[in-house]
Structure formats: C-alpha cells, structure tokens
Design a protein with these regions (language model features):
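Short, Lys/Arg-enriched N-terminal segments with co-localized hydrophobic residues
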Residues: 2-34
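Bacterial lipoprotein signal-peptidase II cleavage site
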Residues: 40, 54-66
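Hinge/cleft segment of the Venus flytrap/periplasmic-binding protein
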Residues: 84, 88-89, 94-105, 114, ...
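Hydrophobic alpha-helical segments within soluble ligand-binding/sensing domains
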Residues: 97, 101-102, 107, 153, ...
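Extracytoplasmic "Venus flytrap"
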Residues: 106-133, 141-159, 163-165, 171-176, ...
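Short, solvent-exposed amphipathic alpha-helices that sit
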Residues: 118-133, 224-228, 259-278, 297, ...
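Hydrophobic alpha-helical
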Residues: 126, 158, 162, 167-187, ...
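Flexible loop/hinge segments that line or gate small-molecule binding clefts
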Residues: 181-223, 244-245, 346-354, 359
Length: 410
C-alpha cells in the first residue's frame, strides 16, 4: 500500500498483495470519506452558481429587456454546469461507495435476545453504523428481539419478508435453523446476512453451489476456544495449580446446540492437550450464556469438588462474571488458587482481567463485525457479489493488553 499526493489530497494506492482485512477497512473508510466529499463538492458548486447569479444581477440588465443579456446567459450556463457537475460527482461517489439510494432501503434485523450483554453492544454499533455512517434512515432500520425463541424469531422474519424489506441481518436463536431461514429469504428474493452464530459448513457451501444471496459475518469460534486454552498455558503453572500433573477443570457451556459453544468447548481443551498437558474434566454443564445460571453451576461445582478445581472455562464473559461471584463467595482467589477465562471482552470482564479477578478473555470484536455485516448488506442491495463467509479475527486479552482493549471499548 502506498500513499500518493494529488493536489490537496492524499490518496492511498492499494496494491494487489495488500491483506484482505486491510483492504476492507480502507474501503469502509473510503465510503464514508467519499460521501462527505460529495456534500462538500455539492455545496461548493451551488455557492459558485449563486455568486455568478448575484454578479449578473448587478450588471445593469433591465426588466423590460426581451432577450437575456450576455451576463445572464453566462450565469445560466454556469449554474447549469455547476449543478450537473455536482450531480455527476454525487452519483459517481455513491456508486463507488456502494451506498446509492440506501436511505430509502429497509433493513430488517433480528437479534436472538436483547438481554444478551454482547449482542447489546453489537446491535447498538450496527444501528449506529447503518444510520450515521452509511446513510440509512433510522425508521428504515428495524431491530427486533427474538426473545430466545426460534419460533418467535421465524415469525419476525416472515413479517420482514411480507413487508418486502430489502435485506435482512439475522442473529439466529438456533444456528441449525439457517437452512430453513435461508430458503425463506431465497424464495422471496431477499438477501440475508447471518451474524455471530455461524451456520454449519455444509449450509455455507450450499450458498455457493446454488448461488444464494447469503453470507455469514463473524469470528471463527475455534480461534476463541484456542485462545482460552493458550491463556491457561501462559500462566506460571500452565493450569496445574496443585502440581498433580494434570489440569482439572469445569466447563460452563452456552448452548450445546450452538456451533460457537461447541467449538469454544472443544478447542479450549484441545489447546492444552495439543501442548502435551493432561486434563481431567470434572464437570461440563449448560449455562445458556446466562450470568445467574453460571453462578449457580460454579457454586455447586465448588461445593462438590472444592480445591480440586483448577480452571473454570466459560463460553462467554457473562457466565465468567457469574462464576467469579461463586469463586469469591467460596473464598477462592483467581490467579492464586484457581483460573477463570471467558469470551467476548465485556467491559466488566476486561476490568477484572486488569484487576486480577479473571485470568483472561477473548475480544469478540463487535465493532468490526457490525461494520462488516452492514457493508455486506449494502453490497447485496447494490447487486454485488458477496463471499459466503466474511471472517473477523478474535483478539486474545490478558493482563498485558487488557488496558488497551478497555480503552477501545470506552
């Protein structure tokens, strides 16, 4: 990537070998910049036309003159030229940005449930980016609460389809419902962007094979699980606090039917075994991504297994916060006689990492995901091809970088 200078502007020249993630961010920034530039060009053009008109009015022409004066002719021509130039500039920029006429397009969004900590941050950023940066009208961006009920969410999607929304962005209650939902959207001719909860690989391949306008935007949950395991390996004892040659752990899952929960559960432990560490699973139980449920699970586990528990893995930070409450109530201290890891990098969890109350978490970058999902929706509206999967990387969060992540969240 090179920076060139042309007139008063700096121009980034993106080379062919520039990483895709960087290209996407440049395109995203470019869209916003272009639209702002269009406004300036339009305003400047209209101002020039007005100035010329005023000059002509002061040139001595009379109301009784049948034919326009030369000054008036020049004014009219200049005004028309300026208006046409502004119009062409606006159209060109809008097409380049892929955001032509989005203000009148309707985006239907369904979130699996509103009281999920992480998805609250995600939907707030998604709504902000669609309306403030991409130019959708606020009333045309409708976000509904799936209430953790797939039947309820499917009904919402049917309503979006009936009302002829232009594109849907869906955080499914159950990722296994993706084939059914995809077919509903396909039959209605409405493109769909799935977020956060990934359909299985076979479904994503079907989109490619059948040329279906569907995509998944999100992180690879295997990466988040691996990072959790690595955070335990990076501790002084590599998780084996009592020195018995193995890591004894409790696993608090989100929803066992959810792909993210499955991968985080599997790959957090796999990171340990791949490193040659022996493990012992004391308990694995469903916490439904819920803080209160996780607190009860951790409390029961601590009562049953006591000091034998060396690590508590949680599929998300909300459950890690609940587990911490149980740990502290039991008189245990994180990073001294027990380790605790989560996923999402909720503000409170990151602060706990800084304070030594949580061993680590994994930043589920809702900023980048929300922008990538919205950009994909705009491309679909514009008739562009969109990859079946748009990946966004997780970021490991430990005491070494937790303050940096917290500053970003604020």
């Amino acid at each position: 990537m090179e920076k060139c200078t042309t007139g008063a502007y700096n121009v980034l020249v993106v080379k062919e070998n520039t990483p895709k993630a960087i290209k996407n961010k440049i395109i995203c920034i470019g869209r916003i910049t272009i639209m702002r530039l269009v406004k300036k060009v339009t305003a400047a053009a209209m101002a020039s036309a007005m100035a010329l008109s005023l000059a002509a009015c002061g040139g001595g022409s009379t109301a009784t003159t049948a034919a326009p004066t030369e000054a008036a002719k020049e004014t009219t021509a200049a005004s028309e030229a300026a208006t046409e130039a502004a119009k062409e500039a606006a159209e060109t920029a809008a097409q380049a940005a892929g955001t032509a006429d989005v203000a009148d397009k309707k985006v239907g969004i369904s979130i699996y449930k509103f009281d999920d900590n992480f998805m609250t941050l995600y939907r707030q950023e998604l709504q902000r980016y669609l309306t403030e940066d991409l130019g959708f009208k606020a009333e045309n961006v409708v976000i509904q609460d799936g209430k953790g009920d797939q039947a309820e969410q499917t009904n919402q999607i049917n309503n979006f389809i009936t009302q002829k929304y232009d594109v849907l962005i869906l955080n499914l209650v159950q990722a296994s419902s993706a084939p059914e939902i995809t077919d509903m959207c396909k039959d209605a001719g409405i493109p769909v962007v799935f977020i956060n909860r990934e359909p299985d690989e076979a479904e994503e391949q079907r989109w490619v094979d059948e040329k279906i306008n569907a995509t998944y935007v999100g992180c690879d949950a295997r990466q988040s699980g691996t990072y959790q395991g690595e955070e335990i390996l990076e501790t002084e004892t590599k998780g084996d606090i009592n020195g018995d040659g193995k890591v004894s752990y409790v696993m608090i899952q989100g929803d066992p039917e959810n792909v993210d929960a499955q991968y985080r559960t599997e790959f957090s432990v796999k990171a340990l075994t791949d490193a040659g560490v022996e493990v012992e699973e004391l308990l694995k139980q469903r916490g439904d991504w819920d803080q209160a449920k996780a607190q009860q699970i951790a409390q029961d586990a601590l009562n049953q297994y006591g000091d034998k528990i060396e690590v508590i893995f949680c599929n998300n930070d909300a459950m890690a916060l609940g587990a911490l409450q149980a740990i502290e109530a039991a008189g245990r201290k994180v990073n001294e006689d027990i380790y605790l890891v989560g996923v999402d990098a909720l503000t409170e969890a990151v602060q706990n990492v800084i304070d030594g109350k949580q061993t680590g978490t994994v930043f589920n970058d809702h900023f980048s995901q929300a922008k990538a999902a919205a950009d994909a929706a705009v491309k679909f509206i514009g008739g562009e091809e969109v990859d079946a999967k748009i990946p966004v990387d997780y970021i490991k969060v430990t005491n070494a970088n937790a303050q940096e992540i917290l500053d970003k969240l604020k």
